[in-house]
Swiss-Prot record:
It comes from Bacillus anthracis. Quinone reductase that provides resistance to thiol-specific stress caused by electrophilic quinones. Also exhibits azoreductase activity. Catalyzes the reductive cleavage of the azo bond in aromatic azo compounds to the corresponding amines. It catalyses: 2 a quinone + NADH + H(+) = 2 a 1,4-benzosemiquinone + NAD(+); N,N-dimethyl-1,4-phenylenediamine + anthranilate + 2 NAD(+) = 2-(4-dimethylaminophenyl)diazenylbenzoate + 2 NADH + 2 H(+). This is FMN-dependent NADH:quinone oxidoreductase 3. Keywords: Flavoprotein, FMN, NAD, Oxidoreductase.
Length: 211
């Protein structure tokens, strides 16, 4: 049985978000096409996603010195435990669907924090004499991103940092097959917003058949 993580980073529901509407349409279609698979939703705005801070660095330092989990402070234990939960959940899944809005040329900061929970040496990648090698082979991802302007092509494509960063990090940890659905231009062309949404939903439903 394939396990799919539906990872969202939007405080709005599908009723108030173009991206979420497309994401939920994809998941609904995927479930219809693959009823035997397990889909787990991870709402990053309602999940404990520790940032790498002084507590985390201190905990890692203690581990490097050979100390155990019991040597950590309560705050360090809570953060390390949450990070490990996020990491283990991700590692044991087969497919990943990220749904994010673009905020100031990137995605919400909680997505960056989440990726920092995942890119852990010895777990999702390893160092070799030829450089780092990703360990999560045989998995695939989909990124659905909603943007008010057009960023998939044209002069602003170079500043689509969220899309590029997510693809880079996933590739670094071994997830080299990443599909992308752009839900874009709704603010630039408000008269076409509904048309843009419907086209993206149709694209998502079609992709669900082969994802």
């Amino acid at each position: 049985m394939t396990k799919v993580l539906f990872i969202t980073a939007n405080p709005n529901s599908a009723e108030g978000s173009f991206g979420m509407a497309v994401g939920e349409a994809f998941i609904e279609a995927y479930k219809n096409e693959h009823p035997q698979d397990e889909v787990v939703t991870i709402d990053l705005f309602n999940t404990t996603v520790p940032a790498i801070d002084a507590d985390v660095f201190a905990a890692w330092g203690k581990f490097a010195a050979g100390e155990g989990f019991e040597a950590l402070t309560e705050a360090q234990q809570q953060k390390v435990a949450a990070m490990n939960t996020n990491l283990e959940t991700f590692m044991h899944a087969d497919r990943y669907v990220f749904v994010t809005p673009m905020w100031n040329f990137s995605y919400p900061s909680v997505v960056k924090a989440y990726l920092d929970n995942l890119a852990i040496a010895g777990k999702t990648f390893k160092y070799t004499e030829n450089g780092p090698v990703g360990l999560l082979e045989g998995k695939k991802a989909l990124h659905i991103q909603a943007t008010g302007g057009v960023y998939s092509e044209g002069p602003y494509a170079a500043v689509d940092f969220g899309r590029n960063h997510l693809k880079t990090v996933l590739g670094f940890i071994g997830v080299n097959e990443t599909e992308y659905i752009a839900v874009e231009g709704m603010n630039a062309n408000p008269e076409k917003a509904q048309e843009i949404k419907e086209a993206a939903i149709a694209n998502a439903r079609e992709l669900a058949k082969r994802f």
